[in-house]
Amino acid sequence: MKEIEVKLRISDVVQTRRRLLEAGFEPEGERVFEENWLYDFPTQTLRQSRSLLRLRKSGDRAIITFKDPPEGNLRYKMRDEIQTEVAEAEVMRDIFRKLGLNETFRYQKYRTAFRIRDESRGHVLLDETPIGPFLELEGATDWIDQAASQLGFSPGDYILKSYVTLFRESCPEQEFEGSAMLFGSTYSQPNPKG
């Protein structure tokens, strides 16, 4: 499946939620806590190729995702992804370890998904992370532009970086240990200068 997305930095979750509802978006479900683990081989083959292997625990669900390297589009983050649900996240973590994969990064967030009723071309994800809140718009490129405009954003606001990169950029260099973006962690606080 082709994933096409952009992130948007927001400052106020309550105001953004209100703006989403006023624009006709409806929550697809409850706000869910997500735990994410990224994996790579000791040789960092995946990182070097800009691919990604992630295990996500989202509420009661556990999902494995593999993402190909992003395409060269400068306006949207586009990449092929394959994912499947697994029964137990902890068992999958053990399997990855036994296969020789290393956990390279762990991050947490709260996510609420929104969609316009009877619209299947895209959805908005409201992410509350330790480095601040973001919207992710996922869908067709024209839908992303239209939804962003409805919410008061323009293509100049689009962020194509991963949460790992945003986290690393938000940490003072001397403090960054690089392995986790967790709520309540010393290393999950954004750099006030950033």
Where are these regions (language model features)?
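A generic beta-sheet turn/junction motif
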Residues: 57-59, 130, 141
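Surface loops and adjacent helix of pleckstrin homology
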Residues: 67-69, 129, 140
